[in-house]
Amino acid sequence: AVELGKVMGARVIAAASTDEKLDFVKQYHPDATINYGDGELKEKVKALTNDRGADVIYDPVGGDLFDQSCRCINWNGRLLVIGFTSGRIPEYKANLALLKGSSMVGVFLGRFRKEEPEAYEQNLNELLEMYAAGKLNPIVTQSFPKEEYVKAFNIFTQRQAKGKVTLEFKSE
């Protein structure tokens, strides 16, 4: 997400729950980093954005982080819901949407592919072109044989993932 944001010209603030994860993400060159493990995400985002808040928030975690993210979004900002690796599906407070003129957008690639196949294909082609041009360099940090899918999935549910975690499907 950091790398894609940078390629698209955004000022990117990367946030993570540990300094170890932030050290990892720095190789993607975010403009700033925030450790939200202390529960002060809003204050830190506001300090980095001249008290405005973030225009777009990418949230793959959900749970308590989602609750904090809703409070540090800028006027007319968008909160992109990618997943719920925290294990808790949060609720979006309508009063925050009203007060901030913000919106929440669910990003579900599987459904997007089904409902808008042409747009999906166009987006995929753009990503592949960026990759071929060397603008996107995903880092695979762990790879598992397909039989160990539960182990790979647990990396996410235990919030231990850094970089890309993949499954190997070998033809026989």
What is the meaning of each model-derived region?
Residues 34, 57-58:
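N-terminal Rossmann-like NAD(P) cofactor-binding module of classical short-chain dehydrogenase/reductase
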Residues 133-142, 150-172:
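C-terminal capping/lid region of NAD(P)-dependent oxidoreductase domains
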